[in-house]
């Protein structure tokens, strides 16, 4: 049986909706299926039911959103110190995703519109900026990507276009646009795109101020056109439309020299009897000075005012001291010492790194000014020869590392177990 364009079958019989029973004259459209018909009103009703269920599931999902204290607790497991930064991040991320859930469940026109709060992380190299962003994304189970600001240029110049950032986050979630629109983007080395001078340049600054201008709309929220599956742009192809309004952008940078700008501002006083006289003897460390950063300092450093305005949440990280670096070596879930012990266990060998060795590793990293990032390099260099020999020797049961080994004054102490050699010979 076939239906003509007026809703009657080929025999001229009047047709009815199989669900609500309305005739073809009572509805706008009647859709035919195998021996059944459905009207446009029933289709719309089904859509409403599904939409309500999706909103309900979104609201129940909001209950699963970890609270700020829970977020900080997870950050504590991976990041040592930086208490203030972790609190700021926990609240900012919680509010961001709470805003997203509110958009999904409430669509009233007269409701208060919640603005997006992107984050700026300021801290020395190896202080934990990238690790904080990675841990947040893993906790929230959202797509996460890292972009290097130093490779970005204005559109039309050699280098990466800012829209490549959206390309990267799409790749992380197999080009699922809806999922990508709720992700986190960490832009590293953001201080490297600062304007080269305080005054706007006459010549074009394609990797500095030009990139800041290009990032403005992307960070605030725009619909970016991205080629599907990472292809090149050409006029005949269809683009994926990605709305960046709900993507959380976290920008991080060391901002070397920013502390001098902050100190010069804080040392300035008034004139006359009402002047606020301030001492020039500022014994605070870099981290303590950076904690006093204000928007005008960032603008003097070289960020344009519009860009600073798009990053309302600012968290500063402290420089890691020896005690913090020792804790980083041993305490986090994925601590380096735990990782190397596990590698040695897989060779049926115990690794002991003594306390004086941990202190020596921390001091070396501080001398190199690489922060926590340099700890792995030092350990890898120290244990390289041992890890080279270990798989070929079945007698080594324990390796001991002390301060002299770290300083290059002696080799790691290897303890041999002759019973292991006998067991190996018996097995042969």
Curated annotation (Swiss-Prot):
Keywords (A to Z) from UniProt: ATP-binding, Chaperone, Metal-binding, Nucleotide-binding, Zinc
GO process terms (BP): cell division; proteolysis involved in protein catabolic process
Family matches, as InterPro entries: AAA+_ATPase, ATP-dep_Clp_protease_ClpX, ATPase_AAA_core, Clp_ATPase_C, Clp_protease_ATP-bd_su_ClpX, ClpX_bact, P-loop_NTPase, Znf_CppX_C4
Location of the ClpX-type ZB domain: 4-58
GO MF entries: ATP binding; ATP hydrolysis activity; ATP-dependent protein folding chaperone; protein dimerization activity; unfolded protein binding; zinc ion binding
Subunit note: Component of the ClpX-ClpP complex. Forms a hexameric ring that, in the presence of ATP, binds to fourteen ClpP subunits assembled into a disk-like structure with a central cavity, resembling the structure of eukaryotic proteasomes.
Function (record text): ATP-dependent specificity component of the Clp protease. It directs the protease to specific substrates. Can perform chaperone functions in the absence of ClpP.
Listed name of the protein: ATP-dependent Clp protease ATP-binding subunit ClpX 2
Organism from which the protein derives: Methylococcus capsulatus (strain ATCC 33009 / NCIMB 11132 / Bath)
Gene that encodes the chain: clpX2
